[in-house]
Amino acid sequence: MIKKTIKCFSVILLACTVMFVNDYALHADNAQNWYCKREKEHLRPCIDPTMSYIEEENGFFIGKDPDEKVIYLTFDAGYENGNIARILDTLKAHNAEGAFFILENLIRRNPELVGRMKTEGHLVCNHTAKHKDMTKLSEKEIEQELCSLETLYKETFGEDLAHFYRPPEGRFDRKSLDTVRKLGYHTAFWSLAYADWDNNKQPDPAKAKKLLCDHVHNGAVILLHPTSKTNADILDDLLTEWENQGYRFGSLLEFTEKA
């Protein structure tokens, strides 16, 4: 009797282990890191077909009209190191709107900068409260990450966050995007970015400017980190160059407009 019980327990334990491993593998396979291959001659990039479902979940990465010379400036701002104010000054000088995807930390430590973003006409958007990997969270935990930032922003500034979301580190899956969509968000990916995030290994300004100018394209959603000294140094020249090429700086709100 004891042997039979142990045998049954072992079978059940094995079955549960297999189910757990299969579920974990399936979940891991579904999780993806966003990327967009840069194209030459200012051509608009395409995305991997396995990522095309983002549109079904209120996601976007590039402007709708391939013939319109428009650029969307977006910034992932988790903290301040002296460069965000410089970025804001440059945007103001060019009357260019940006979308800032912020974390809880920035509101708590630098509310004056977030206030500037708001009062100077930029969109203040949701990059989650604590920059967690959303593909590893439950629906309830995802909701908590977004809604706690919403609440803090509302309590601090008396207004609602713009309902645009950017997944931390570009990590996503259908489940997380679907949860975000149900909360009323559009997920903003990007069509042009470069390695600007490491403050201890900043890109050469001339090379960074050339890369961005060589690969800009109609409808570009550009991701920049406003903590980057390189970005703060070159942004004025970039905006001037793009203006001279006939680009306008658009608002992410255009992505929510009906055709």
Locate each region found by the language model.
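N-terminal pre-catalytic segment of deacetylase/amide-hydrolase enzymes
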Residues: 2-74, 79-93, 207, 238-241, ...
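Enrichment for repetitive, rod-forming helical segments
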Residues: 10-14, 39, 134, 173, ...
